[in-house]
Amino acid sequence: MVAEVAPSFVGQFGPAATPDKVKAALKLIGFADVVEVGWGADRGTVEEVHHYAKHVATGEARFLATSCCPAWSVMAKNEFPEISQSLSQAYTPMVETARHVKKTHPDHKVAFIGPCSAKKLEAMRRTIRSDVDYVITFEELMGMFAAKDVDFGEIEGEPFADAAPEGRGYAVSGGVAGAIASGVHKLYPEVEVKMDRAEGLANCKKMLAIAKAGKREGYLMEGMACVGGCVAGPGTLQPINKATAAVNKFKAESPIDLFEGEG
């Protein structure tokens, strides 16, 4: 089985549980390999950069709303069906990464490890259930580490190098829209990016109501069900500010230039 870990995993399991040690610990308890979900986030970012510049900024499409948060996207589709076509059509990072893993490890199952209980419902969708076999929250994983007596102080780490800063930044509020806007600025410097974002479903509904009224034409809109982003998900273990700082540090450490060779 291969573990795909959401970007918000950083710092969740205590100060000794550095990213490289979490990867090693997952292998220690039985996973054959470990992949950053940030890899899939990067793929989605590139797709959305081109879509915004070619279709939204030109007026062909009304606006582009992110879709990686399942609680937000399901709410948008259910309560604002007339604008649901403006939600990003890119696969969510979980699904994009899982499909990649199934290609590189065809005989393995995939377990998504993250902060989000809504991902359990996403993984049950008919079009996704063959890609993601299991969903485990950080809280549940901590129980597995405890059951296996994992001591992060005694583990030798194994470095991660799957995701660019953009994908790793998806874990915090503003990170998704920020990644897309950064890509547009780099690849389409002549294009102005208009942005709006909301945290918490009540605020997300207000943002969508404004868009429905025609007041967000040409915008890039990010919705996050959890205030603070994925680092505030129901399956997390650390305070939001502490988790956000850890994610930002991990983001800055990425050696990958996502937009090198793009254009």
Predicted feature residues:
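Iron-sulfur-associated redox domains of electron-transfer enzymes in respiratory
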Residues: M1-G263
